[in-house]
Regions:
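Acidic-basic catalytic patches of nuclease active cores, encompassing PD-(D/E)XK
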Residues: 1-36, 110-117
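Residues lining hydrophobic/aromatic ligand-binding pockets adjacent to catalytic sites
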Residues: 3, 88-91
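Conserved catalytic cores of phosphodiester-cleaving nucleases, focusing on short active-site segments
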Residues: 37-52, 56, 63
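Short, charged, amphipathic alpha-helix that recurs within catalytic cores of restriction-modification
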Residues: 52-68, 99-114
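A structural signal for short, well-ordered beta-strand segments and their strand-loop junctions
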Residues: 70-73, 125
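Short beta-alpha junction loops
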Residues: 74-79
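Glycine-rich, charge-decorated loop segments at or immediately adjacent to ligand/cofactor-binding or catalytic sites
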Residues: 80-88
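Long, low-complexity, charged/polar intrinsically disordered regions in eukaryotic proteins
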Residues: 92-161
Length: 161
């Protein structure tokens, strides 16, 4: 699996969102209560979470009694896919995905942190992003696309915030 580009092995979407919400890198990756906050402004914590909200529970237990916490959830709105051949390094021309993201896609992740949703210190930002996604041609189907591994996603535009 490819490692991320930035601090703590983060990938492009995470790094771009972090720099968008806090251009001052002194606010990035701040240790608080045995955890590392993506962004700490001095008054609030901002966590960029691209998936797996269930992994946030222990962090929320530590952060919410101390500070307001905003979870930013980037959702792919319009996505262009390109495929990377692992053997040759060749990248296919991009094509538009038939799926269009919307805020309702957050419900599955929000369900994983439902006990925290009524906490007045918890805030959510759903960021709809148009993005380019690169996938490896390493899946199990004949054309190697089904079950393939996502290599990276690159945001190209904020569709809605």
């Amino acid at each position: 699996m490819r490692q991320g580009i930035g601090t703590l092995s983060e990938k492009t979407v995470h790094a771009v969102m972090k720099n968008y919400y806090a251009p001052d890198t002194d606010m990035h990756e701040i240790p608080i209560e045995n955890f590392v906050a993506d962004i700490y402004t001095g008054q609030e914590i901002i966590e960029i979470q691209t998936r797996a909200f269930n992994k946030m529970r222990r962090k929320l237990d530590a952060f919410l009694p101390l500070y307001p916490v905003t979870i930013v959830y980037p959702i792919p709105h319009i996505k262009w896919l390109s495929w990377i051949n692992e053997e040759t390094g060749e990248t296919s021309p991009k094509r538009k995905s038939p799926k269009t993201g919307n805020p309702y896609m957050a419900f599955i992740e929000l369900y994983k942190i439902r006990p925290y949703l009524s906490n007045p210190n918890l805030h959510l930002k759903l960021a709809l992003l148009d993005m380019e996604e690169y996938r490896l041609l390493n899946g199990w189907s004949r054309d190697k696309k089904k079950g393939s591994e996502r290599y990276d996603r690159i945001p190209v535009k904020f569709a809605e915030e």
